[in-house]
């Protein structure tokens, strides 16, 4: 057989092999990226930077909050002191505004006679709305963000940035925790906190100090009855949900610490997860948005796997 006559058949056979089902592995789905992740794609909780809040109702379960010392070092240090000294124990959730925030602290904070002492915590702190962008280990999203020129993740936290100003800041995504303030920008000290329980109110960015995010248990806050007074505050004391206690992981016995870990946001696995969310490949999807934003690219949290 001549070479010229054998080429078409050989070429067809080669093409059939190349384009055969399974010749190339399909890009993974979100679930597959998480399932295939390795131990180094996850990180443990930092004991001094994690709070566990328990509501008075034991059915609510623990609310685990990871603090963000890189972005709000003064507030985080103060919150550590408040939690260590038991400031939040016995206080209450004082406000639940639908599609907005759940807020907790001292119901008598405005009363000079009844307000709970802050102990050794600072009463006055500087506003911590943003930090220098330079040298920040930001994993950027290529997707357009309507609120900032740049967005991405640092230490598992959603971040926006403006390279022209050289500043970066945490964003008000679902589950983010902030320090309530009055009119003065430096009137927050971490004794009054809130968590976002609705659509991301990004207009609050750069107006309030964000201190971390809820890793586990946000449903306990999001499912509380809504306050009926102005801005979702409770009009009667008996409407409030009590707080049993708030502790740092560092102050808890090993056996009581939540055994969870967080996916790192500086790895190839994290970037693969972002791509899988951007281009949905699950069979159910008939349309893929080919876009994500910093507030719907949620960082996974899972029960810690045994090393053995």
Question: What residue spans do the PLM features occupy?
Answer:
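Bacterial N-terminal signal peptides that target proteins for export
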Residues: 1-11
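Cyclophilin-like peptidyl-prolyl cis-trans isomerases
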Residues: 24-308
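N-terminal signal peptide c-region/cleavage motif recognized by signal peptidases
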Residues: 20-21
């Amino acid at each position: 057989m001549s070479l010229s006559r054998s080429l078409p058949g050989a070429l067809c056979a080669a093409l059939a092999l190349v384009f055969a089902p399974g010749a190339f592995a399909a890009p993974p789905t979100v679930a597959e990226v998480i399932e295939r992740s390795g131990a180094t794609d996850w990180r443990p909780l930092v004991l001094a930077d994690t709070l566990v809040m328990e509501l008075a109702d034991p059915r609510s379960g623990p609310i685990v909050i990871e603090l963000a010392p890189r972005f709000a070092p003064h507030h985080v240090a103060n919150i550590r002191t408040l939690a260590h000294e038991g400031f939040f124990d016995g206080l209450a959730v004082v406000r639940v505004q639908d599609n907005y925030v759940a807020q907790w602290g001292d119901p008598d904070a405005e009363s000079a006679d009844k307000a709970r002492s802050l102990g050794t915590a600072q009463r006055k702190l500087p506003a911590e709305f943003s930090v220098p962008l330079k040298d920040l280990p930001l994993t950027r999203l290529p997707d357009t963000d309507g609120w900032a020129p740049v967005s991405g993740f640092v230490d598992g936290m959603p971040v926006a940035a403006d390279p022209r100003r050289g500043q970066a800041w945490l964003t008000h995504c679902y589950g983010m925790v902030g320090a309530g303030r009055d009119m003065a920008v430096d009137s927050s000290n971490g004794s009054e906190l809130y968590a976002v329980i609705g659509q991301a109110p990004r207009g609050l960015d750069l107006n309030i100090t964000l201190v971390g995010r809820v890793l586990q248990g946000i449903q306990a806050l999001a499912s509380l009855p809504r306050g009926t007074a102005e801005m979702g505050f409770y009009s009667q004391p008996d409407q409030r949900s009590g707080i049993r206690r708030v502790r740092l992981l560092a102050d808890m016995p090993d056996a009581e610490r939540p055994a969870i870990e967080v996916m790192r946001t500086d790895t190839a696995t994290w970037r693969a997860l972002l791509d899988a969310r951007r281009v949905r490949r699950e069979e159910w999807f008939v349309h893929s948005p080919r876009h994500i934003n910093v507030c719907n690219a949620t960082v996974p949290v899972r029960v810690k796997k045994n090393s053995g």
